[in-house]
Design a protein with these regions (language model features):
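Long, ordered, helix-rich scaffold segments
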Residues: 63-68, 77-293
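Beta-propeller domains with acidic blade repeats across secreted/periplasmic ectodomains
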Residues: 1-98, 109, 113, 117-120
């Protein structure tokens, strides 16, 4: 599927990862810290409903601010932890070059913090170093951080994006498809990415392709529907663009023999396409659609 599916772990089928008998416990966020452990943000309130959702006669006994000074952060450490000392972060005093090197850190917190600080500083003297990091790093996560640092410093170009579109890591290709939307020179590579072996990459490439106004994308959108049209998500991805919800797309499908074999999902597509064209309410498109009905 082109989307994430959350599932309980095998050891958590009959228990919660984190629970409390305290009815004020309101876990609101989860993150990885600089030490690699999990940190849970507990907003800790007696009530989380707003007064607007509570009948007026019940509000008289309710203090909606109760607990607003009692929020806390929990640090969750595995029982197997050996208590190994960890490096206390001080990235605010790091040189820009050191921040670039930190994009290769094994811990997500260090990498994302280094990326944020690089973008805040906007020291463009390190752009060559970041480009080299993207080209030479063996870690796809580091290559991805480098890409977005370049994007945030307005140093991204079509050559780099084309390389990212062909990256061996699916996650890098998926993000490269988003970045390719700004570069017409990447259109051909982006079109080919709609046939990627990774459904998530193919899905994002389909969405990104719709940002272009070039009618040459229509045959590729039609091919995507032929391959993945059974999925409502792929149909929505195609229909989300102007050209992907046009009579020209309908003509391309007809020409390819799309309607030769009747299938329920194809009926759904025709209905969704007609509804989208109708909602857009462009007279020329409506006229052309009715002529083909």
């Amino acid at each position: 599927a082109p989307y994430m599916v959350a599932k309980r772990g095998a050891q958590e089928k009959d228990k919660e990862f984190l629970a409390s008998t305290d009815t004020w416990f309101r876990p609101a966020g989860l993150s990885v810290g600089p030490d690699g452990h999990l940190y849970v943000i507990d907003m800790y309130r007696q009530h989380i409903e707003t007064p607007l959702s509570i009948p007026a006669d019940l509000q008289t006994d309710m203090d909606f601010d109760a607990g607003n000074t009692m929020g806390r952060i929990y640090r969750i450490v595995p029982q197997s932890s050996t208590g190994v000392k960890w490096e206390k972060p001080n990235l605010k005093d790091a040189t820009t070059e050191q921040l670039v090197n930190t994009l290769s850190h094994k811990n997500k917190w260090w990498r994302t913090t280094a990326q944020r600080l690089l973008l805040e500083r906007q020291d463009k003297t390190v752009i060559p170093q970041v480009k080299q990091l993207f080209a030479q790093s063996n870690d796809p996560r580091t290559r991805l951080h480098a890409l977005y640092v370049l994007e945030g410093m307005d140093a991204l170009d079509a050559t780099i994006v084309k390389a990212a579109l062909k990256d061996p890591a699916a996650g890098v290709r998926e993000n490269a498809a988003i970045l390719a939307e700004r570069f017409p020179a990447c259109l051909n590579d982006l079109q080919r990415l709609t046939e990627d072996s990774s459904l998530r990459v193919s899905y994002q490439a389909t969405l990104s392709l719709g940002e272009f106004k070039d009618k040459n994308i229509i045959p590729w959108l039609a091919k995507t529907l032929q391959a993945h049209g059974q999925s409502k998500w792929f149909r929505a991805a195609v229909l989300s663009s102007e050209l992907g919800s046009s009579v020209d797309l309908l003509d391309a499908l007809t020409k390819s023999g799309f309607a030769d074999k009747a299938e329920d999902w194809k009926k759904d597509l025709y209905k969704e396409l007609a509804e989208t064209i109708g909602a857009r309410n462009q007279k020329s498109q409506l006229k052309d659609l009715l002529q083909r009905a």
